[in-house]
Amino acid sequence: MECISISFRSAPEETRKRFAFPAGETGIKEREAFLERAGEAVLLSTCNRTEVYAAGEGSFGRLEELLSEKSGMADTEVKRIARRFAGEKACAHLYRVACGMDSMVVGEDEILGQVRTAYLFSAERGLCGYELNAVFQGALACAKKIKTETLLSKTSVSVATLACAEIFRFAKLCGKAAASPDGFGAAEADGEVEP
């Protein structure tokens, strides 16, 4: 398996947006067209990353060309910002991504569902053979186990929940009332929540 990754680790947000696939019917058609040309592959596209996992070897050139077409960027620029993983390193990268260990916020919750959705999208269209099925099912099982059996499962973690917590903390420091981070009532400056 090989993986080509364009993420927050290698490209700024404005660049990453050029590789993103929209939601809705338009996005579905774009993903299908992309994957049809990519071959046996899974496409993961989130706000922080676009990654293509392809079965076998020798796919980097083809995937870089497809990503170049998608983004409107030159092949050389795509090569400059893309991270490449092959074989066991590609598998290890997928496991880190699915578990939230390669996220902007380590342990964030959303990525597991996004990986599952990307995998099922390809599997339902017959684009996953034995290798991709085995690797993705293993990564999803591992991520689920980590989420249920480690401290990562003790709190809900995402960029949004952390931002809300920071707003709440800042309002408290300023002596202002703010909506509580759990969404119930207003929190006074002393931290007590009013119903």
Describe each region flagged by the PLM:
Residues F21-A23, A55, F121, A186, ...:
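Intrinsically disordered, low-complexity regions enriched in small/polar residues
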Residues E77-K176:
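Glycine/serine-rich phosphate-binding loop and adjoining beta1-alpha1 elements at the start
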Residues M1-S103:
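A glycine-rich (often HGG/GG-containing) alpha/beta subdomain
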